[in-house]
Structure formats: structure tokens, C-alpha cells
């Protein structure tokens, strides 16, 4: 198999990969019963599921307070204590925009909020029309210079019970602790359980062919480290799983960003989903606690609302960092991302880091590349003998196959030697694709010149055109034995097809492919010179 056919193989693999990933994002089937059994024991739906917020609609916001830290700006509704707006201070809404990115919002036609409350026999959050109206000491709270932690207590009293709902935010963190403290002076026992869920409009946001994205639910249990549960899944079947030993979380994820509730109860919780109208919920329900009169009890959960930063998320909850979904080649993509981040810390530019990573990857793969070209050169040297063999043997395929294998063995040629290195390189490309696609660090990161955002396509298509030209040069430098007119036309058209595809790829990925092609040209020149000295190649 010569280099021209290898390029065809790469093209077919790339197109297949693009079509597969688009299908994989769109087709996210609900877990079967056996999967549910593996990920946690099935429990009845929470008792409050039918009467909590029975009617879809926008949450009433008679009064909200503003909470500001170095990385977050939140709006919290004093009715119920829901987080109804979350601005990420370090992330712009669009490239070169002064507006910050809004992850949680409560707007007509687009609701995405984080709700929490107390339910159970004496619950105070059993209905959307009857939730507690908390008292707060101020309308705004700001994490001051030199202050590492900000606590916002909200108080409510009813029927001899004192409730304090406290939000705890820390400097540099997107994790928010939500704590309930209940003091029972009612003269009777009181039973409560805490719930916390994310509510979002059911929507379809599949991205493009070259950059498909997922927007929907995801969860983790003790037995299932990470699993998506799309809005379609929620509409098909309500999920109800047991989170044993206090492990697990429920999340809503999208490209680059995620929100998640992590229960902080060692006794275990119930993970649930449901759809009400056009609103989808995914959340956790912690077990009830009975508080004797004169006693007090506390409930706690952590809300993550921010970018997909793997190190921080891993520190908040086990497996939460897996929302950075590298696909089935995660074991390759994750080390590549780690290496890329390490290089970026040295060169302080993500574009330069991609270039350095390309040289490292292609350097590590040089033995495979050399073996590939050497094998192809030997195969070309055998072409006259193979042609004569076909003329001598005719249509006897079995004899032809036997004599070909004897010839390969005699000449010490592996007929797959030119193909296998290419197949081994494809997982690297696919893994790097996901590493770049899932890296929020590359979002709106500039390179040089006209490349002002490595996560967006080249605005002037210069990199894709250069990439196509480099492919054309590789073709011209590669000897070929292809004589079939149709194959020749396909190979001639291949750089054009690749260029078209890469017009819509993020410029960071096109940069990798362009530099990889340049390295290929350099390696190709060096290998051909060495093969010429051995008589295996001629100009």
C-alpha cells in the first residue's frame, strides 16, 4: 500500500469519525434496565416529586440579592433561596465582548436555575406557590480584598422552627456550599429532607458536524463513574437511583461549562430526573431527618457552577472532572491535555503549546513513520515481480496469494507495514481533537496575527488553505504506483476535500494538522534521502 492510498485511508477514517461523533452526540439512548441495576438500586420516585413545583413556569423573583466573588456574580431569590443567575466573571459571553458569560439565567423562554429546599412531612418547599420568604441582612454581598470566604445567611421562622439557609463561597472557587440549619422549638418532632436540583428548558443544541456539542443531564454513582442522561432520556423515563455511601452527583452540562449538585450526606441520597412541561430537572434528594423538639439538625449540598476545570472539579467530588468528556479514547486524550497544559505554562500561549505538542507527538511517532515509508518503498520495489507473477499465474487467486506471501517472506516485506502506522496514528489525531474541543482553556485564547480565538474557525480561512497546500506537497513528494484513473482522481481531489472540512474546524486543530503536515514533509525528505542511499528510492 503506497502513500497515496494511505492518504485515502486517512480521509475515509476522518470522514467516518466526523459522522460517528455527530451520531454519537445526537444518539444518547436511555440506559437499559441492566445498566440501571449496575449504577445503583432503583428506588421509588421521591415523595415530593409529584407536588413540588407542579406547574411549569418562571420562578417568581420578588426580591433577589447579589453575591459577588472574584470569579462569580450570583443572583439569589429570597423566595426559596434559589440561584437564578450566575455570571462567570473571568469568561466573556462572546469573543472580544465586555459582557460576562451567563451560565444560570432566569429569562422568558430560557430558564436554567439551581433550586434547593426542604421537603418531607414538615417541609417548607413543597409547592412553587408556597415557599419560604427569607430575611437577609443586605441586598448585596461582596468578597472583599484579603477575604477568603464569604457567608450569606438567610433566615426564616415558622411554627416554632428556625431555619437558616447559608451560602458559602470561597475565593477562586466555583463551588458553593449550601447549608441548612434547623432549630426545633415547636414542641413536636419535625421531619425534613433536603433536595437540590438543576432546572433547565428542554432544548436541542447539537453544534455543527465538525464540532458537535452535548447539552443535557449527566450523573455519577458509586458504580457508574459518569453517564449522560439527555433531555430525550428524561422525557422517556424518570430516573431514580440510589447514591450509596454519599457518593455521586447530578449535573447539567454543555460545551465548556457545567453545573452540578453534590449531596453531602453519608447516609446516601436519591438521584432523580423529571420533566414538567418544557422544563427538565435533574437532582438529588437526601434522606429525611427527624428533629426532636429542642434539638437542631443540618443539611448540606455543594453546587458547582462554572467552567469545566478538571483539577478543581476533581477536588470537589469524585469523578466530577469526567464531565470533560474525551470520549472512548480518554486514556490518550487526557495525558495529551495534561502535556498541552504543561507546555502552555512554559510558553504562555496555547497556539505555541499546540505547535510544541505537535513536534513532540510527531517526534515520538517518527519510528512508525520511518517504518511506514520503508515498507512502502520495499513494496514499490516488488511491483515488477508482482506484475510478472500476475501475468504468469492468471486468475488462480489461491496460488497467487500463496506465491505473494512466499515473496513477501523471502524479501522480508510486511504488506501491512505501510498501513498499520497510519492506523496507529489515527487514535492520536482523534484524541487530540477531543482534547482541544473539550478544553475550556482554549476558549477565546489568541494565537498570533489574525488568529484571535483558537476555539473558533479561521475567519479568513488562511490556515485551512495552507493545510490543503501542505497536503498537496506531500502528495507530489510521494511516489505512487496507482494506475487506476478513478483512484488518481480521488487522490487529486483529496486535498480539496480536506481543505473544505477544515474550513469549519477550530483554528487550534487546523494549526495542529498544518504543523503536523510540515513535520511530515521534513521527515519525508530525511527518510527518502536515507532510502536513496539504500537503493530503495529514486527521485
UniProtKB/Swiss-Prot annotation:
* Cellular component annotations (GO), alphabetically ordered: plasma membrane
Return the annotated region ranges for Disordered.
35-55
Lineage: superkingdom: Bacteria
Q: Which GO terms describe its molecular function?
A: membrane insertase activity
Record's subcellular location? Cell inner membrane
Q: Which ranges are annotated Polar residues under compositional bias?
A: 35-44
Q: Where are the transmembrane segments?
A: 6-26, 341-361, 416-436, 454-474, 495-515
This molecule's function is given as: Required for the insertion and/or proper folding and/or complex formation of integral membrane proteins into the membrane. Involved in integration of membrane proteins that insert both dependently and independently of the Sec translocase complex, as well as at least some lipoproteins. Aids folding of multispanning membrane proteins.
Give the record's subunit note.
Answer: Interacts with the Sec translocase complex via SecD. Specifically interacts with transmembrane segments of nascent integral membrane proteins during membrane integration.
The UniProt similarity line reads: Belongs to the OXA1/ALB3/YidC family. Type 1 subfamily.
Protein's UniProt name: Membrane protein insertase YidC
Designated gene of the protein: yidC
Amino acid at each position: 500500500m503506497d502513500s497515496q492510498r494511505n492518504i485515502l485511508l486517512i480521509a475515509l477514517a476522518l470522514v467516518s469519525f466526523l459522522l460517528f461523533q455527530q451520531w454519537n452526540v445526537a444518539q444518547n439512548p436511555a440506559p437499559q434496565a441492566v445498566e440501571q441495576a449496575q449504577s445503583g438500586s432503583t428506588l421509588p420516585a421521591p415523595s415530593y416529586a409529584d407536588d413540588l413545583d407542579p406547574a411549569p413556569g418562571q420562578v417568581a423573583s420578588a426580591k433577589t440579592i447579589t453575591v459577588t466573588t472574584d470569579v462569580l456574580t450570583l443572583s439569589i431569590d429570597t423566595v426559596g433561596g434559589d440561584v437564578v443567575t450566575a455570571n462567570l466573571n473571568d469568561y466573556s459571553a462572546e469573543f472580544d465582548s465586555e459582557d460576562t458569560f451567563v451560565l444560570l439565567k432566569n429569562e422568558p423562554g430560557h430558564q436554567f436555575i439551581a433550586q434547593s429546599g426542604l421537603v418531607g412531612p414538615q417541609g417548607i418547599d413543597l409547592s412553587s406557590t408556597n415557599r419560604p420568604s427569607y430575611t437577609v441582612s443586605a441586598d448585596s454581598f461582596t468578597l472583599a480584598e484579603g477575604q477568603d470566604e464569604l457567608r450569606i445567611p438567610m433566615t426564616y421562622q415558622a411554627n416554632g422552627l428556625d431555619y437558616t439557609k447559608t451560602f458559602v463561597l470561597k475565593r477562586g472557587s466555583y463551588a458553593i456550599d449550601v447549608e441548612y440549619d434547623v432549630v426545633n422549638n415547636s414542641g413536636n418532632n419535625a421531619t425534613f429532607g433536603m433536595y437540590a436540583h438543576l432546572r433547565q428548558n428542554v432544548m436541542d443544541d447539537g453544534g455543527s458536524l465538525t464540532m458537535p456539542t452535548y447539552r443535557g443531564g449527566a450523573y455519577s454513582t458509586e458504580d457508574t463513574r459518569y453517564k449522560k442522561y439527555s433531555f430525550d432520556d428524561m422525557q422517556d423515563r424518570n430516573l431514580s437511583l440510589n447514591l450509596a455511601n454519599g457518593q455521586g452527583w447530578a449535573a447539567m452540562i454543555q460545551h465548556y461549562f457545567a453545573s452540578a449538585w453534590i449531596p453531602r450526606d453519608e447516609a446516601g441520597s436519591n438521584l432523580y430526573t423529571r420533566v414538567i412541561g418544557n422544563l427538565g430537572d435533574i437532582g438529588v434528594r437526601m434522606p429525611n431527618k427527624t428533629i426532636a423538639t429542642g434539638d437542631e439538625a443540618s443539611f448540606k449540598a455543594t453546587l458547582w457552577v462554572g467552567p469545566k476545570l478538571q483539577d478543581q472539579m476533581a477536588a470537589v467530588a469524585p469523578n466530577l472532572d469526567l464531565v470533560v468528556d474525551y470520549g472512548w479514547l480518554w486514556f490518550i486524550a487526557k495525558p495529551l491535555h495534561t502535556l498541552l497544559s504543561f507546555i502552555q505554562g512554559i510558553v504562555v500561549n496555547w497556539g505555541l503549546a499546540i505547535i510544541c505538542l505537535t513536534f513532540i507527538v510527531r517526534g515520538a511517532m517518527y519510528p512508525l513513520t520511518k517504518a511506514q515509508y520503508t515498507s512502502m518503498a520495499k513494496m514499490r520495489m516488488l511491483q515488477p515481480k508482482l506484475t510478472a507473477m500476475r501475468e504468469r499465474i492468471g486468475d488462480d487467486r489461491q496460488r497467487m496469494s500463496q506465491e505473494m506471501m512466499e515473496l513477501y517472506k523471502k524479501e522480508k516485506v510486511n504488506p501491512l507495514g505501510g498501513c498499520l502506522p497510519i492506523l496507529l496514528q489515527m487514535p492520536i489525531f482523534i484524541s487530540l481533537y477531543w482534547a482541544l474541543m473539550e478544553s475550556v482553556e482554549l476558549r477565546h485564547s489568541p494565537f498570533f496575527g489574525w488568529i484571535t480565538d483558537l476555539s473558533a474557525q479561521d475567519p479568513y480561512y488562511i490556515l485551512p488553505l495552507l493545510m490543503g497546500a501542505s497536503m498537496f506537497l506531500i502528495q507530489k513528494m510521494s511516489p505512487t504506483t496507482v494506475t487506476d484513473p478513478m483512484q488518481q482522481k480521488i487522490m487529486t481531489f483529496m486535498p480539496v476535500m480536506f481543505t473544505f472540512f477544515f474550513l469549519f474546524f477550530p483554528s487550534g486543530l487546523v494549526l495542529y494538522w498544518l504543523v503536523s503536515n510540515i513535520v511530515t514533509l521534513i521527515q519525508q525528505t530525511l527518510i527518502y534521502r536515507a532510502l536513496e542511499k539504500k537503493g530503495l528510492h529514486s527521485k
